[in-house]
Regions:
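Non-heme di-metal
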Residues: 1-140
Length: 140
């Protein structure tokens, strides 16, 4: 097979992976709303399709894995590689992404959103720590 890295197909797979992943989360959110509104059959429909979207995302990721994690660029494969990728992603989120987003929200007058993003930064820091502990257990 041709080299995937740096091709338009690589970019297309990354966009498709992101889209399918987001569809999964959106449909799970919609399912919660349908449950609250008393539509359990519609909620089940959303959950069923969300699971299908997960399968689509996993299919894209199978191809992307040969190049590396589409978010972090870190190698995908062994559990230690996957933990390192997770640590890289979570660390970026709590050190750069959410602090930057929070500052922008605050600068634009969205204090409640800024505070929410700061909560998420703390959560992502915790996630990075938990993944780091998981990696350390592999090295024991």
């Amino acid at each position: 097979m041709a080299k995937l890295s740096g091709t338009q197909t690589h970019e297309n797979l990354k966009m498709a992976f992101a889209g399918e992943s987001q569809a999964n989360r959106r449909y799970l959110y919609f399912a919660q709303k349908a449950d609250v509104e008393g539509y359990p059959d519609v909620a089940a429909l959303f959950r069923s399709v969300a699971e299908g979207e997960t399968g689509h995302a996993f299919g894209h990721f199978d191809f992307l894995a040969e190049v590396g994690d589409p978010v972090t660029g870190v190698a995908v494969g062994a559990t230690s590689d996957n933990l390192n990728s997770a640590i890289t992603g979570e660390t970026f989120e709590y050190t750069e992404m959410y602090p930057g987003f929070s500052k922008t929200a605050r600068d634009e007058g969205f204090e409640e959103i800024a505070e929410w993003l700061e909560v998420l930064a703390r959560a992502e820091k915790s996630h990075a720590g938990r993944f780091t502990q998981g990696l350390e257990t592999l090295n024991d």
